[in-house]
């Protein structure tokens, strides 16, 4: 049985967001020369993080909708042609990007929905090689996202909150990430241990992100 949703070559990991910048620099340096995408929610964070990586000797560029089209196109080409290793982006990046050998996708901020998470992490390992999907989680980020929703139409707020709750329970769960993700898409994952997510490799007490 082959599941259309199961990306068996992707490793899913959630970390509490205590010292994310430091963790990201270490993570990338351990994978020198490999291609990766880092997603942030705000353009400001995209710029800051790209600068921080450059200052730490990592070839990185920013990408977001606030940049002019030419700069965006150039930065995208530099990433595709491997003149840089890392693109730090808002979710505007990746639509129609086909780079098969992206080795990791990092979410600096928790995505607004599991569907978004699945789509964005799915940009790793399209060549069938390994892909590491690392997400940083803190409850502060959730509160920030909830604040963003205020002022939107009530129905939209309700849907947004539900989607966010699903992401929170995924992040805080100690169950197999793959099982939870597939269940969300209406599929059951038969194995009790996928061997390819943080919860299966290092079973741990519940992450309490403060």
Where are these regions (language model features)?
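Helicase motor core with emphasis on the C-terminal RecA-like subdomain
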Residues: 1-154, 159-162, 187-191, 196-199
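Cys/His-rich short segments
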Residues: 163, 168-210
